[in-house]
A protein has these predicted regions:
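Acidic (Asp/Glu-rich) sequence patches and key acidic residues
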Residues: 1-160
Length: 160
């Protein structure tokens, strides 16, 4: 039993009655039986795997931009290096030492998870012939790609 990856087009961003940003998702394709994909990724699929990359489809090929994960990793590493956790949650009556220790462990764990997700995504992209490109390259591809290129955002979901 392999992992089935579903690619959805994201469109029509709007705010719902509770003030949350929501969008319309239309399934446009899937990649079946990705059995070589890392089993451990199952744990991270429900915690934002899809938000890790933006996808586009051009001339029969998928392209991916991992900007969100890369930026989050850089920001987390910078936060750990500077030891500045001031924007993170502080429990009531928590002294500075406990606060810093707890948040340092949290950031270290987050960095490990992000590195794992980036590595897993890269392996998935390689196995499925999805090229990783920058935002600028994606914009240029869409602009110059003609009718077979879609400029919408795509996201991945998965089922086992």
């Amino acid at each position: 039993m392999g992992l089935d990856i579903y690619i959805e087009k994201i469109s029509d961003y709007r705010t719902d009655e509770k003030g949350r940003t929501v969008s319309t998702r239309t399934q446009i394709g899937n990649l079946h039986g990705c059995s070589n994909f890392l089993d451990e990724l199952n744990n991270s699929l429900n915690s934002g795997f899809g938000s890790g990359a933006t996808y586009s489809f051009c001339e029969g090929k998928f392209f991916a931009v991992r900007k969100t994960l890369i930026e989050d990793l850089a920001e987390s590493e910078k936060k750990l290096e500077s030891n500045d956790f001031s924007d993170l949650y502080r429990f009531a009556n928590e002294d500075d030492e406990k606060f810093n220790k707890r948040n340092k462990e949290y950031i270290e764990d987050k960095i490990r998870q992000l590195k794992f997700e980036i590595k897993s995504l890269d392996e998935f992209f390689k196995e499925n012939d999805i090229e990783v490109i920058s935002d600028e390259e994606l914009d240029e591809l869409i602009e110059n790609g003609g009718e077979d290129c879609y400029g919408e955002e795509f996201e991945v979901s998965a089922s086992w």
